[in-house]
Amino acid sequence: MARTVHCIKLGKEAEGLDFAPYPGDLGKRIYDNVSKQAWADWIKHQTMLVNENRLNLADARARQYLARQMENHFFGSGADAAAGYVPPSA
């Protein structure tokens, strides 16, 4: 049986993550409060941030920026929008 959490991002009960996706206290908070669906949404947003801002993940500052954005996305006022991103029109 799948583990469920009350997802802080979706505001409903949903399937929880299988393991903490990030080390430390932030990873534990995410594991306890974020669903698989919300985590997948974050991965898509993180990919846009990396691509649109041309972040080099070998740079510690870029990784720190993404960690702050991840915390804001789930537990704060929301992550930055991807600069220059234009959603496709239907």
From Swiss-Prot:
GO terms for molecular function: iron ion binding. The keyword Iron applies. The keyword Iron applies. InterPro entries: Fe_traffick_prot_YggX, Fe_traffick_prot_YggX_sf. Keywords: Iron. GO terms for cellular component: cytosol. One of its GO terms (biological process) is cellular response to oxidative stress. Could be a mediator in iron transactions between iron acquisition and iron-requiring processes, such as synthesis and/or repair of Fe-S clusters in biosynthetic enzymes. HAMAP family: Fe_traffic_YggX. PANTHER family: FE(2+)-TRAFFICKING PROTEIN-RELATED. Belongs to the Fe(2+)-trafficking protein family. This is Probable Fe(2+)-trafficking protein.
